[in-house]
Amino acid sequence: MKKKLINIFLAGLILSVTGCGNTENNSAGGIQPQTEKSSGDTVQEAEGGEMSEETSEGTNGSGSVTEGTEVYRGFIMDNVLHSESDGDIHYHVHIPERYDGSEPYALFFTLPGYEGLYFQGVGENLYSEDFGFTAQEYVKDMIIVAPQLSDWGETSADQTIALVEYFLKNYNIDRSRVYGEGYSGGGETMSLVMGKRPELFTAYLQCSSQWDGAYEPVAESRTAVRFVIGEEDEYYGSQPSREAYNTLHDLYEKEGLSQEEIDELLVLDIKDEDYFTSQGVAYQHGGGNLFAEDDQVMGWLFSK
């Protein structure tokens, strides 16, 4: 726990240097984590460098892949999708051992904050954030992809879309269970993805971030969105999340949805100061990694 709090503080400190509450929660619910835990933290050689027999070729939604050769806590590290249109896309991937392509699996994409971008070092996204690991406690039959992109703008958004399309084409994926999460700058990137291709996803969890993408496509696709952020987030503040929530809420009202129907699709979850300080965290923005351990937050995502 002490190590985790130190990591949270360091991530927040980096974000504050780089520029990278009263609780409001209009929807509870969600599934509880299952009981299987991750393995140790040691980086190991991947057996034969093999990731999946299906990850060798493709055309739109595909491309050639250079597979990683090391494993960290169940993730094959630093695979590279070579996309003709979007360049080299680095990512880590967790594929359950029992996956053989005969049954459809869920798919989860987790995008990191500034401290986890590729230029910070291979694997820094997994070393500094826990979303990719705690997700495994909720859904066992799920492939988890942790891209390491270069920024939080349009280029990274397009690369994320290309990578999602690749997995949808080359793996047996249950299209009704495709989940996205973005923390800080990763949330900005994923919001751009949502503004471009929301129909790729079932639900999106935006953590300690702001919305940079379009809204209308999200309302049209009915992709569920939850905004979770500290009331006094030191980088973004909570107001951008409130405004994004209100914009989507207004769009749904114009389409004639009832409040009950809107609540199924849209959640504004503002955490007060006590949420962080009671868990030993003084810096709300860096403390966003606590959301990875929050059953209500993560359970909501994987219940959709």
Please annotate each region the language model reported.
Residues 105-107, 111-161:
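Active-site machinery of serine-nucleophile hydrolases
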Residues 113-117, 149-154, 184-188, 209-213, ...:
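Solvent-exposed loop/turn segments at secondary-structure junctions
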Residues 140, 219-225:
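Short, proline-enriched alpha-helix->beta-strand connector loops that line the catalytic pocket
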Residues 170, 176-220:
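Primarily recognizes the serine-hydrolase "nucleophile elbow" in alpha/beta-hydrolase
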